[in-house]
Amino acid sequence: MEKKQKVVVVGAGPVGSLAALYAANRGDDVEIYELRSDLRDPTTTPLNFTKSINLALSERGINAMRHAGQPKLIEHVMGATIPMHGRMIHGKRANGDLFEESQNYDVYGRSILAVDRGRLNERLLDILEAMPNVTFFFNHKLTGADFRKNKAWFEVRDKTGAAQGQQSREIEVKFDLMIGTDGAHSAVRYHMMKYTRMDYEQVYIDTMWCEFQIQPKTVVPDAPLDSKFSISPNHLHIWPGKEFMFIAIPSDDGSFTCTLFAPATLYEHLESDRTGSLVPPFFDKYFPGVTTLIPPTELIDSFHRNPHLPLISIKCKPHHYGSSVVILGDAAHAMVPFYGQGMNAGLEDVRILFDILDKHARMDELSACADRAVSREHALAEYTAVRVPDAHAINDLALQNYVEMRASVLSPVYRLRKFLEEALSKYVPSLGWQTKYARVSFGNERYSEVVAKSEHQGKMLVRGIGILSCRVGRALHNE
């Protein structure tokens, strides 16, 4: 009988939890190590986040969960989401009237889903806890690793995050495979760098973010479900400001999780008055209508109480070392949140990794190869070769989409291209034409292929418009 593999997962967020689930379903012994306390404990606040974070869940993330071998997982997750059919652009006309303009994501009516990150994480952890081959180790900090000898060391901490006792207690853990899903400031990646010549690029963009909340409306019993929402629950709401923007994502309790994205200099300006008196006038000027949804006193309180956090973009290569370690999610490719693909890309990492591991395992069975380490090494090398260009592509797309969300959504050129591409997709489907957004959010083709196809479509559109303009000009000249 084949000996079980021991898989150590570092980081118990959604990506790490899904990776643990994939490994456990394949019969491996799985240990999950997490720096924080149990993430299901309401007193545990995720690192770098406030209490409530709503995220966009799209086809890639759904598909990864669909293949996790737990049918009730997808049923539970989908039941707690809100479909967002498109963007709702907010602004003020020249005459002072407020307006809302809906821009659907997709000509076929497909939606992305607003999901509560914490609840998704809780469901994954609950499933894992019921599995006999899964063990949790919360309050454990990775302090060292030897990826040649397949050993790691963890410092045991108390619930406050402090080391236990005057002399911290450290444990040694052996493993066959370590999966690093411990976020942008990954300890696994840090220790992996000691063993492989890793290309690494880290960029902090000149944008900070702060969270706000639109509270649910008070409604009478038996009122329609939508009546608890102050604005449409089926849209991602955007107040574009060219150099900054404000967004709102719905929650199923009727509230909206809102975020102000703005340059650090603007935050410094708003912080300069400790009374907060600069905040409401700023919102009134650039985000019309928000102060009717969030009272000025709440805006000021949230601005001062909630952290002002930077946005980081990380690229690295390779994503593995030998047969012993691989990094997924933000540990491998932290990205800015403007394409709604951070979590989706991380969940997709898991599916692709295990697809490749399974493929190599089947190949070894056919060739009667008994060395799983050799098989794993080949699989991890293929994973890096496949995933790095796609990770870099979605990183770049996320940065580009910030410009689109805060400025281009109001551009006639942007709207014209979107209209033409959607018309071609709907009325001439044989061309295989789709918008870049549809390819990213509603399909599973590689990100790098999406970029290549979008660039090709852009060139074809420019060429087509140029030819049409020449013919129209020639016809007018002949008249």
Swiss-Prot record:
Its EC number is 1.14.13.9. InterPro entries: FAD-bd, FAD/NAD-bd_sf, Kynurenine_monooxygenase. Its cofactor is FAD. Its main location: mitochondrion. GO terms for cellular component: mitochondrial outer membrane. One of its GO terms (biological process) is kynurenine metabolic process. It is an enzyme of class 1 (oxidoreductase). Belongs to the aromatic-ring hydroxylase family. KMO subfamily. This is Kynurenine 3-monooxygenase.
